[in-house]
């Protein structure tokens, strides 16, 4: 409560807020006693760690944009949408500055050693990641649907469409229709690195919302293509979602799988382009994964990293990630 964060985890705490807001949206009577306090406390206190929720890591900032948009959706309190829009401006001002277009991971001078470990981040501007560019597209698309004429007509939708055109031409989506981790800055080509589950999920709700804005099904069609390809390429024989690091993820990568699960639930509940067979595939995916978590990855309500088991040590990242899948399954039941 002192920091408004969970275990001092900065961007994972944004995902906890998003998960709880999602739970609140579908089960308000069950959630309200918890979420009323969480939303107000985190909103008031967490930015004491980084004023304005800005730390120069564009992906971190954009996770908070998505969190406060989700909270706005369930509270209708404009202060949350105001905050999301304010945070977004930092990334908007930086978009397009890389040699390949798009957005960097991080401002060169940004680093708070007490909160973040920089070993994996691009302090020297040597890589352009998928994550921050997916988050940018999704954040812009969501802001466009909630503030289509503020601060001016087209302000956000133009950013979302620009980000979409950049992303599909970037090469980040590979021949298997899944998304690699980034671009090689020397060649502006797909770096062929890890295919993480969260990179398959972040884009999905933004693409679905672009179809809402434009009436063009191609955006939602791409979301379905990526989602189905991820289920094919990132699940085990039992259909349980995996990540390349599942036997040794760090505290950040522990968060990843839940992002994909939450995105699949969004498509089931809110996508306007979804045939019955694809919907059934998504619903089954969520239920199978939630059941596996509870049967094989849960001890005394503590949820571990590997959704197929064996049971492991829980952290706020593994807990909230697994809860994304469980909440998702409940929301589509």
Language model: regions and residue ranges:
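CBM-like carbohydrate-recognition segments
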Residues: 1-59, 63, 71-74, 80, ...
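Long alpha-helical scaffolds in large eukaryotic adaptor/regulatory proteins
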Residues: 27, 75, 140, 147-150, ...
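Extended ligand-binding groove/face enriched in aromatic
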Residues: 37-146
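Active-site cradle of extracellular carbohydrate-active enzymes
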Residues: 133-136, 140, 144, 153-210
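Acidic, serine/threonine/proline-rich low-complexity intrinsically disordered regions
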Residues: 148-154, 212-221, 270-283
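Oxyanion-binding "anion nests"
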Residues: 202-214, 218-235
């Amino acid at each position: 409560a002192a920091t408004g964060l969970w275990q001092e985890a900065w961007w994972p705490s944004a995902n906890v807020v998003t998960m709880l807001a999602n739970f609140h949206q579908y089960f308000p009577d069950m959630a309200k006693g918890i979420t009323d306090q969480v939303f107000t406390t985190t909103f008031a206190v967490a930015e004491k760690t980084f004023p304005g929720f800005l730390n120069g890591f564009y992906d971190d900032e954009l996770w908070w944009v998505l969190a406060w948009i989700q909270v706005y959706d369930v509270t209708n309190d404009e202060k949350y949408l105001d905050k999301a829009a304010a945070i977004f401006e930092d990334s908007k001002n930086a978009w397009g500055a890389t040699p390949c277009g798009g957005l960097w991971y991080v401002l060169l001078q940004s680093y708070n050693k007490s909160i973040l470990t920089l070993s994996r981040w691009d302090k020297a501007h040597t890589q352009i990641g998928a994550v921050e560019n997916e988050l940018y597209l999704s954040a812009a698309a969501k802001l466009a649907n909630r503030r289509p004429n503020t601060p001016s007509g087209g302000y956000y939708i133009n950013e979302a469409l620009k980000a979409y055109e950049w992303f599909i031409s970037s090469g980040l989506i590979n021949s298997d229709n899944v998304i690699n981790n980034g671009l090689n800055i020397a060649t502006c080509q797909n770096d062929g690195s890890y295919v993480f589950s969260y990179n398959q999920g972040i884009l999905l709700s933004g693409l679905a919302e672009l179809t809402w804005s434009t009436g063009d099904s191609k955006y939602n069609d791409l979301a379905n293509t990526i989602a189905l390809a991820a289920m094919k390429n990132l699940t085990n024989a039992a259909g349980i979602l995996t990540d390349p690091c599942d036997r040794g993820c760090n505290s950040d990568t522990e968060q990843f799988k839940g992002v994909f699960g939450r995105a699949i639930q969004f498509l089931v509940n809110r996508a306007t382009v979804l045939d019955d067979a694809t919907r059934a595939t998504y619903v089954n995916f969520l239920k199978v994964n939630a059941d596996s978590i509870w049967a094989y990855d849960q001890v005394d309500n503590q949820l571990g990293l590997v959704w197929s088991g064996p049971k492991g040590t829980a952290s706020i990242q593994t807990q909230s990630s697994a809860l994304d899948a469980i909440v998702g399954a409940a929301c589509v039941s």
